[in-house]
Amino acid sequence: QGKNAGSKMHVFVSHSQDAKKNPLDYKRKVAYIRKMFPKYAKNITTDKAKTIFEVAVSLYNRGYKSIVMVVGSDRVDEFERLLNEYNGVQSKHGYYGFDNVEVVSAGDRDPDAEGLEGMSASKMRSAAVDGDLDSFKQGVPDGFNDAEKLYRDVRKSMGIREEKDMGEMDTYEK
């Protein structure tokens, strides 16, 4: 939830798509995230904003005077610098002029941890490539019933063809 009482949370989903690192298209990502987190489904923003600047402009145009952006720990410094550098500046991305811009980390992952704590999108993609549904399922929230469908969608979007077990062949025709 928002850091300040009465704050509204918006979740902006990446529009990026490529077979290797971002296999799902935007609409599919939004649909899966809404299913994974039904309590926050209305907070998942379907906005054309594709960059941090476009997100900031979108929020400013909605009347927000202050923002707290939560991002991966590896992006905090970069996003804080960029958002503050262009705050109050008319540029090609548009204009935003917030009283306060704060960028905070979504938290650090322990890559060596087991289960959800150590899970990452990279590990989930790797499990999908390896055909390891059980490991893939460790990366989805408890209660999410479409893990196998998500797994198949990720594999398909990565260009991985499903293999069917045809059984053993022990007799040959001449």
Residue ranges and their predicted role:
Residues 1-173:
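Nucleotidyltransferase catalytic core that binds NTPs
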